[in-house]
């Protein structure tokens, strides 16, 4: 059945690739917090209820990792993603130029058709991290993809001299990687046009591995910025951006805001590439520190979720792994963290963002810092629940609105991102 239905779906998708679909719409809220944590076991197995809805956190039904409010596809869950395993085993050809693209697209279309309902309108994230689509971005352990590409070129073009073979390896890899990522997005958007499709960790920034020197600025690495400019085709093909703002375990807390700010500013920069209106930016936030497993502190939440809201991101995606729901004890730890720390802060930020939107932007845009470097300006309610002073914020209007306070209607589809 798969082999019969898949190509038929791809054929229909191919006929629609030039339809000129408008960007999908985002729920009408200035700042969204989404739950991408596999916590379904907490209630189903251990009877521990996590009150996400009451805390203003958007989750899938039953709190499943994949669902109709948001979904993420890992490397083995959509099509035939090529990569090398830990022992060097090639999966799906190992490198993009060895992959039969039509078979990949057929399978991806089949999987999307059967996993997401036609009206799906949430974030749909592709998590493909094994290689970078640009040759120069494959350093460290990723050099295996350069070596395999050179071996491929030597086999396919045996009569060329080594320098020409290297050129074929380089161009062949980049062209095939681009076709794979671009066409996967196009197929996905044609099948589920209201979904917010994009790749996790794109754009990169390269600001997380600097030394702990006192002169840390948080600015993105120059080479990474140049690669992001080269990836203009990826931003043009995406309908949302999902940068990672996971706090580095060794980075001093005093530098957290600079780290997050520059990652988001780079996402805002490329969000305009190939689009009349900037793409929504939804940053990935990890609930626990990678090495210690500790939940993010109140200050960590301010410097990740709070900074994202203050800079004008469309929202954040909260991510966690299966360990958070691996036992009744772990589920209660998660429950207590939600109720005591995370939930109250999410309520504060989302309500403040909504209040600022209505007070300053007529409800037709989101508030963002006038000066991104104004580190003390946040969208927070006062401790007594009263509204803050939004003088440090200006309006970023939704699609269909313009003016300093988003008071002027503009023709075109309305977008509330």
UniProtKB/Swiss-Prot annotation:
Facilitates sperm penetration into the layer of cumulus cells surrounding the egg by digesting hyaluronic acid. Involved in induction of the acrosome reaction in the sperm. Involved in follicular atresia, the breakdown of immature ovarian follicles that are not selected to ovulate. Induces ovarian granulosa cell apoptosis, possibly via apoptotic signaling pathway involving CASP8 and CASP3 activation, and poly(ADP-ribose) polymerase (PARP) cleavage. Has no hyaluronidase activity in embryonic fibroblasts in vitro. Has no hyaluronidase activity in granulosa cells in vitro. The gene is HYAL3. It comes from Homo sapiens. Disulfide bonds join 42-331, 205-220, 356-367, 361-395, 397-406. InterPro entries: Aldolase_TIM, Glycoside_hydrolase_SF, Hyaluronidase, Hyaluronidase-3. The lineage of its organism: Eukaryota, Metazoa, Chordata, Craniata, Vertebrata. Its EC number is 3.2.1.35. It is found in: Secreted; Cell membrane; Cytoplasmic vesicle, Secretory vesicle, Acrosome; Endoplasmic reticulum. Glycans are attached at residues 69, 215. Belongs to the glycosyl hydrolase 56 family. This is Hyaluronidase-3.
């Amino acid at each position: 059945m798969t082999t019969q239905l898949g190509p038929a779906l791809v054929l229909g998708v191919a006929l629609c690739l030039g339809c000129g679909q408008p960007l999908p719409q985002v729920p009408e809220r200035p700042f969204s917090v989404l739950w991408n944590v596999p916590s379904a076991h907490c209630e189903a197995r251990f009877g521990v209820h996590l009150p996400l809805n009451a805390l203003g956190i958007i989750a899938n039904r039953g709190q499943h990792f994949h669902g109709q409010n948001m979904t993420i596809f890992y490397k083995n869950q959509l099509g035939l993603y090529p990569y090398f395993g830990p022992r060097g085993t090639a999966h799906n050809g190992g490198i993009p130029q060895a992959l039969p693209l039509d078979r990949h697209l057929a399978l991806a279309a089949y999987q999307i058709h059967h996993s997401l309902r036609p009206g799906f309108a949430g974030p749909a994230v592709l998590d493909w991290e094994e290689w970078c689509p640009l040759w120069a971005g494959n350093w460290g352990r990723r050099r295996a993809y350069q070596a395999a590409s050179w071996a491929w070129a030597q086999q396919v073009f045996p009569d060329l001299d080594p320098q020409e073979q290297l050129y074929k390896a380089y161009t062949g890899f980049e062209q095939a990687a681009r076709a794979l990522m671009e066409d996967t997005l196009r197929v996905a958007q044609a099948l589920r046009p209201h979904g917010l499709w994009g790749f996790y960790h794109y754009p990169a920034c390269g600001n997380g591995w600097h030394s702990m020197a006192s002169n840390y600025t948080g600015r993105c690495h120059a080479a990474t910025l140049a690669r992001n400019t080269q990836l203009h085709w990826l931003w043009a093909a995406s309908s949302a951006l999902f940068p990672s703002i996971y706090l580095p375990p060794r980075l001093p807390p005093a530098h957290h805001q600079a780290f997050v700010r520059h990652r988001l500013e780079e996402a805002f920069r490329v969000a305009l590439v190939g689009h009349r209106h900037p793409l929504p930016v939804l940053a990935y936030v990890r609930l626990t520190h990678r090495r210690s497993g500790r939940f993010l502190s109140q200050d960590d939440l301010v410097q990740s979720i709070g900074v994202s809201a203050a800079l004008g991101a469309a929202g954040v995606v909260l991510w966690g792994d299966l360990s958070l729901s691996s036992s009744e004890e772990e589920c209660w730890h998660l429950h207590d963290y939600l109720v005591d720390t995370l939930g109250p802060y999410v309520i504060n930020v989302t309500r403040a963002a909504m209040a600022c939107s209505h007070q300053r932007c007529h409800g037709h845009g989101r508030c963002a810092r006038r000066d991104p470097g104004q580190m003390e300006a946040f969208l927070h309610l006062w401790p007594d629940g009263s509204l803050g002073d939004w003088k440090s914020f200006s309006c970023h209007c939704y699609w269909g609105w313009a003016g300093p306070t988003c008071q002027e209607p503009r023709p075109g589809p309305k977008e509330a991102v």
